[in-house]
């Protein structure tokens, strides 16, 4: 029921939905669009503000979205309980424009479950038309809408059985449409014609043939002909949709046909269609869909993945190329080059998002680019959005946009990636606490709209509750409870976020709640059969026996405290609502706390419960579509509830302090799931309003802030939504009570406090030093600065005067020039006006003459038409006279015939009367004779009548039985006749079917004969191919003979690489030895640091003593004239500062100095040894590098000769193809032989990324240790290691090239 004023308004959303395809889009240069719940968020990148496009109450969630090319319209595909729809918004006004449902077109014959993709045509047609594509388990239907008038102009079933992903329009031709999906790729053409409307529709399902394609696949191309009738009086013509066969893609390889086509792009630079396959291939087609090539620089061919295969996830186009997002967060940039026809798009940039984001496992879900092409937005699977600033690519320069220069910024927050299990808010601070299935706990600030703390755990947190002061949070895990502090420096996963108290074992805690005062917290301990609510004392951690409440047999879904913490309420899936009174005096008297509410409702699964502000009424909801109300009576337990029927299921409830409104979250599979319903309380009014919030998965938790300003909801879609309450009375009550503002205190640990104090003291010292320095510098340079400024002012004034004079002169000159130009322009305009007047006058005269000529022609034609009319009228009158004469003759003939028939009738009547007279006379005589006979027979009959009466009664009974049997037989006969008629009809239908089957059999016999002929021809071709195969086998054997010695050479090379590996292992062992030495030095350094700290502390103490001693000496000097006082003061000073009577001098032990010198000598010897070993290693590596470079040159030469030989072999094979007569021409094969240099070349095996990473980390550790010893040694060692890395990489490239050539030879 609607008709109420708006009580809440959406203010902010934490979260997004990355399951929707192409969920990220630029609205303009500073605003982006992404879905969140059942809303589309318009996010400003500058001020972080949000605006929203909200769905309607008739539907439940968003399945797809699309922006028009001019960003004028936003189309949302929404899910419904039965049928989906498309909602179109005006982006200028942010209001809903149209709602396109299935009832607007003849779409009831399809099984449409939801819309998968929406596309707007080009800029000229976006205000009228829109195309939509359905899928997700139902029929795959392509629909054409006229959204300006809300009509469906046409639809067609594509017949695809797999998932369909995307639909789009060609930029240059708005009539061509491309559809891609899993094992589906089609191009459709929209043709508007002037044909007469027809009722029949032709359909054909385009399918990808699996087993019938050979090396070149040809698929059927569906062409969508939408023909609208023109010249008809009907204002709403219905379209006619047809499919025609054609070639979709020609020469497409067979292994690509059955792939998953993830995305496609219509390029702006040239008329290319780029199609992306999930397995990493990029297909290049022309604008008609004809296959051109598979790009050589596809990600599959040059990117090495950890999982073994790279996957393409998303793509976006720009003016001169496109970006491709792949798995493992890899982004590639392809640029268009005009001169290269073979490879028009080349990969010019490549980077990984993991280089800029400190996340372990991330995958890209969506990608988009702004119109200026300087910003790239990337959406990740963890619901985060990153903005990357991009520089334009210039082929003249090298390293245009290196990864180090990229600016990467996080746009949104660290959102949850799974459904939210629990949520709670704080009374004294504007914070929200949430836990999710992604094993994280997050603390949000809804006033500053930011995240404060994010923790990650190894196990899932099921529930949590915030302390009213905001310094602590209680979290329930699978087998324990944890109490954790919310500290300032506790936002990361460090050792500081450990719980300060842990309660275990505590099984399956799904609900936990702090009391309003914070002195208690209640938690549910769930075992296999019992569900016990335990109340703990927060400050002591005790759980008294009288605060253990039993009674639930199923899962407890909600716990609530009264406002004064005197009642504890609970409800669960067992259909029970229980309440206990917490009284301190009463608890000490008895060990068992009685229940004040004990309600049992079998078959009801309660999910939410709340109390009114006066603590008198309980309101609960469950899955029975009712609201249950119960009034608390402390004297007598309550066991019944008052029910109010609803049309949906509710999941959670919340009351503001005014008690005038009741907010409820909807979680219903039928309708309106995810919305917030606002009731007017009391519920007898029956008025409510629904507000859209989350998607169809429903609302999980709902809370109202302590000042009644906001209502906060959390859903299973992972989003947190903040709504502002518009009810002024609710906030007025809290303001009258004098409610304080939020507290500004923060919790901090002692170690953090010490660090802050030390940093503060250091900064104060630095400030004092800088202030003193600045004061001294200022006093010295102030006068000089004043003089310089005075001279600058004078010089500037003179320069400005000169500039002003020059500007005046230039101004006068420009004014004169402008006046002259204006006069010239006026003259030109006057001349042009005169010329135009003369032209228009001539044109008008010519038009007048034409008009008069047309008038004359019109009069002549009228005269001719009048003459024709008179002739036609005369001819018509003559024809009418002829027809009248003919019909008059026919009438006369019919009249004569009528007279003859009447005469015959009269004659027959007379004869009939005579016959009747004779019959009457004969009857009279017969009657007289019969009377006489009857009189005689009457007496005999009377005698027999008495006897016959008894017989008659018997016969009557028999007759009645026979009549009944006769009626039954008649009814049976009628039924048999009906069955006979049905059998006749069936017989005729069967005969017709037999005739049709005979015709089909004849047609199939014909086709079988034709196919047998085809098979015979194919067998002939197969025999020819076998002959050709025999020749190729012979050639392959010859090639294998040549390959064997090359394989031997490769084995020798592998042995050499193994030797190199052993040498590298020795180097690693030497590096490890150096690492141990560095660790020992590091430990000595730490001990030295500790000694330095102690010495500094002693120095500070001594300085304090010295300052105090100076003060005492100064006070003693005041009494230098008075000898007695001077003696007393000196004695006092002696007693104060001299504790020991004898002062001993400290002397350094000689053994310590000897050990120190010996250690110094040993370290110097080690340094000299390291220098010598490094010099030797440098010389060895230089020689190896020179030798390896020479071998690489030889290898490159050999590879070039092998490539030339492979090309000659392929040309020879093409020339050996059999001609029509079956003859072949053999070409001699020449295989190059490897040189002896290639045998001795060292080639390393491929090195894994993990080994490379471990080596780099070891090198970094060694470098850190060496910096403490000698910087010159570190630089030399680093140069050697860098040269080794480059050598290894070069050898790895050579090894990969050899494997590639070997693979080509084996294929040839």
Swiss-Prot record:
InterPro entries in UniProt: CFA-57, WD40/YVTN_repeat-like_dom_sf, WD40_repeat_dom_sf, WD40_rpt
According to its UniProt entry, the function of this protein is described as: Associates with components of the nexin-dynein regulatory complex (N-DRC), a key regulator of ciliary/flagellar motility, and might act as an inner dynein arm (IDA) hub or linkage.
Organism equals: Tetrahymena thermophila (strain SB210)
Gene Ontology CC, one term: cilium
The entry's localization annotation reads: Cell projection, Cilium
Question: Can you say where the WD repeats lie in this chain?
Answer: 57-99, 110-154, 415-454, 504-546, 551-590, 645-689, 694-733
Q: Name one Pfam family in it.
A: WD40
Listed name of the protein:
Cilia- and flagella-associated protein 57 C
Keyword set includes Nucleotidyltransferase: no
């Amino acid at each position: 029921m609607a008709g109420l004023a708006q009580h809440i308004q959406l203010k902010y959303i934490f979260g997004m939905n990355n399951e929707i395809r192409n969920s990220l889009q630029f609205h303009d240069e500073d605003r982006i669009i992404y879905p969140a719940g059942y809303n589309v968020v318009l996010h400003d990148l500058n001020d972080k503000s949000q605006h929203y496009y909200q769905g309607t109450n008739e539907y439940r969630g968003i399945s797809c979205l699309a922006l028009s090319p001019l960003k004028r319209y936003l189309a949302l595909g929404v899910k419904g309980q039965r049928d989906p729809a498309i909602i179109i918004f005006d982006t200028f006004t942010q209001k809903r424009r149209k709602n396109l449902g299935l009832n607007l077109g003849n779409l009831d014959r399809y099984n449409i479950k939801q819309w998968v993709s929406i596309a707007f045509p080009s800029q000229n047609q976006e205000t009228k038309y829109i195309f939509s594509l359905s899928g997700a388990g139902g029929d795959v239907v392509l629909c054409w809408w006229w959204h300006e008038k809300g009509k469906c102009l046409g639809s067609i079933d594509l017949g695809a059985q797999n998932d369909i992903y995307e639909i789009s329009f060609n930029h240059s031709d708005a009539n061509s449409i491309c559809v891609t999906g899993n094992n589906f790729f089609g191009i459709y053409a929209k043709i508007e014609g002037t044909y007469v409307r027809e009722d029949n529709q032709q359909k054909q399902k385009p399918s990808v043939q699996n087993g019938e394609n050979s090396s070149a696949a040809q698929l059927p191309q569906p062409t969508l002909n939408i023909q609208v009738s023109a010249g008809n009086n009907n204002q709403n013509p219905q379209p006619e949709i047809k499919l025609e066969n054609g070639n979709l893609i020609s020469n497409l390889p067979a292994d690509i046909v059955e792939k998953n086509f993830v995305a496609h792009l219509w390029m702006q630079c040239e008329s290319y269609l780029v199609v992306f396959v999930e397995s990493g291939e990029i297909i290049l087609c022309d604008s008609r869909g004809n296959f051109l090539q598979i790009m050589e620089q596809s990600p599959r061919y040059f990117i090495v993945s950890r999982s073994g295969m790279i996957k393409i996830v998303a793509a976006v186009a720009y003016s001169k190329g496109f970006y491709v997002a792949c798995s493992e967060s890899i982004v590639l940039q392809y640029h268009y080059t005009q001169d290269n026809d073979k490879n028009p798009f080349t990969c010019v940039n490549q980077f990984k998002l993991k280089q800029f984001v400190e996340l372990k496992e991330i995958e890209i879900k969506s990608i988009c680019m702004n119109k200026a092409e300087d910003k790239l937005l990337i959406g990740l699977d963890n619901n985060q959005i990153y903005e990357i600033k991009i520089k334009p690519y210039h082929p003249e320069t090298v390293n245009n946009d290196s990864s180090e220069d990229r600016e990467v910024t996080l746009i949104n927050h660290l959102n949850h990636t799974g459904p939210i299990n629990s949520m709670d808010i704080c009374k004294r601070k504007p914070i929200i606490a949430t836990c999710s299935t992604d094993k994280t706990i997050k603390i949000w600030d809804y006033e500053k709209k930011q995240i404060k703390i994010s923790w990650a755990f190894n196990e899932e947190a099921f529930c949590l509750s915030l302390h009213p002061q905001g310094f602590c949070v209680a979290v329930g895990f699978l087998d324990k409870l944890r109490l954790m502090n919310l500290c300032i420096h506790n936002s990361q996963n460090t050792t500081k976020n450990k719980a300060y108290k842990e309660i275990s074992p505590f099984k399956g805690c799904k609900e936990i709640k702090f009391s309003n005062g914070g002195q208690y917290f209640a938690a549910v301990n769930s075992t296999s059969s019992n569900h016990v609510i335990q109340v703990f004392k927060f400050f002591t951690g005790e759980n008294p026996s009288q605060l253990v409440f039993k009674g639930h047999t199923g899962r407890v879904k909600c716990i609530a405290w009264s406002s004064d913490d005197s009642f504890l309420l609970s409800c669960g899936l067992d259909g029970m609502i229980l309440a206990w009174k917490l009284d301190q005096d009463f608890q000490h008297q008895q060990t068992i706390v009685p229940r004040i509410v004990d309600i049992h409702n079998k078959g009801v699964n309660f999910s939410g419960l709340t109390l009114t502000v006066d603590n008198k009424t309980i309101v609960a909801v469950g899955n029975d579509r009712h609201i249950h109300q119960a009034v608390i009576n402390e004297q007598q337990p309550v066991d019944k509830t008052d029910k109010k029927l609803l049309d949906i299921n509710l999941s959670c409830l919340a009351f503001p302090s005014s008690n005038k409104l009741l907010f409820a979250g909807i979680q219903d599979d039928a309708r309106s799931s995810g919305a917030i319903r606002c009731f007017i309380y009391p519920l007898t009014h029956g008025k409510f309003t629904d507000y859209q919030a989350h998607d169809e998965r429903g609302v999980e938790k709902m809370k109202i802030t302590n000042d009644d300003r906001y209502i906060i909801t959390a859903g299973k879609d992972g989003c947190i939504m903040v709504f502002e309450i518009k009810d002024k009375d609710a906030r007025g009550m809290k303001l009258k009570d004098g409610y304080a503002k939020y507290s500004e205190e923060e919790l901090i640990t002692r170690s953090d406090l010490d660090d802050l104090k030390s940093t503060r003291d250091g900064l104060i010292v630095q400030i004092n030093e800088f202030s003193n320095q600045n004061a001294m510098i200022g006093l010295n340079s102030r006068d000089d600065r004043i003089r310089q400024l005075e001279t600058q002012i004078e010089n500037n004034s003179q320069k400005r005067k000169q500039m002003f004079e020059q500007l005046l002169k230039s101004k006068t000159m420009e004014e004169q020039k402008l006046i002259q130009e204006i006069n010239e322009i006026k003259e030109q305009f006057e001349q042009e006006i005169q010329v135009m007047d003369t032209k228009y006058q001539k044109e008008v005269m010519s038009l007048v003459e034409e008009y008069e000529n047309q008038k004359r022609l019109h009069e002549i034609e009228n005269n001719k038409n009048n003459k024709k009319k008179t002739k036609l009228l005369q001819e018509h009158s003559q024809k009418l006279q002829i027809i009248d004469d003919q019909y008059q003759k026919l009438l006369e003939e019919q009249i004569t015939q009528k007279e003859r028939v009447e005469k015959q009738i009269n004659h027959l009547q007379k004869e009939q009367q005579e016959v009747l007279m004779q019959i009457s006379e004969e009857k009279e005589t017969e009657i007289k004779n019969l009377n006489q006979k009857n009189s005689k027979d009457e007496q005999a009959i009377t005698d027999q009548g008495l006897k016959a009466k008894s017989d008659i009664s018997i016969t009557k009974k028999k007759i009645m039985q026979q009549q009944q049997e006769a009626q039954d037989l008649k009814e049976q006969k009628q039924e048999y006749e009906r069955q006979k008629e049905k059998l006749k009809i069936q017989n005729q239908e069967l005969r017709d079917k037999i005739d049709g089957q005979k015709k089909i059999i004849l047609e199939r016999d014909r086709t079988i004969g034709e196919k047998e002929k085809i098979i015979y021809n194919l067998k002939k071709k197969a025999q020819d191919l076998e002959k050709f195969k025999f020749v190729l086998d012979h050639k392959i054997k010859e090639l294998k003979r040549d390959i064997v010695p090359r394989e031997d050479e490769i084995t020798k090379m592998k042995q050499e690489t193994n030797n190199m590996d052993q040498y590298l292992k020795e180097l690693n062992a030497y590096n490890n030895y150096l690492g141990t030495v560095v660790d020992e030095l590091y430990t000595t350094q730490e001990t030295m640091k500790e000694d330095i700290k102690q010495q500094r502390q002693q120095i500070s103490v001594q300085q304090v003593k010295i300052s105090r001693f100076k003060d005492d000496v100064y006070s003693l000097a005041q009494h230098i004239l008075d000898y007695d006082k001077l003696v007393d003061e000196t004695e006092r000073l002696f007693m104060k500062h001299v504790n020991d009577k004898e002062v001993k001098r400290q002397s350094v032990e000689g053994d310590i100095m000897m050990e120190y010198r010996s250690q110094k000598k040993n370290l110097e010897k080690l340094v000299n040894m390291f220098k010598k070993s490094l010099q030797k290693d440098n010389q060895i590596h230089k020689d190896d590098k020179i030798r390896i470079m020479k071998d690489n040159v030889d290898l490159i030469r050999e590879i070039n000769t092998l490539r030339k030989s492979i090309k000659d072999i392929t040309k020879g094979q093409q020339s050996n193809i059999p001609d029509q007569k079956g003859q072949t021409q053999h070409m001699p094969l020449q295989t190059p032989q490897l040189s002896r240099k290639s045998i001795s070349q060292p080639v390393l095996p491929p090195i894994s990324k993990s080994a490379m990473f471990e080596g780099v980390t070891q090198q970094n550790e060694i470098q850190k240790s060496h910096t403490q010893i000698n910087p010159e040694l570190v630089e030399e060692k680093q140069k050697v290691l860098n040269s080794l890395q480059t050598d290894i990489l070069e050898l790895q490239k050579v090894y990969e090239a050899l494997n590639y050539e070997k693979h080509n030879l084996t294929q040839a």
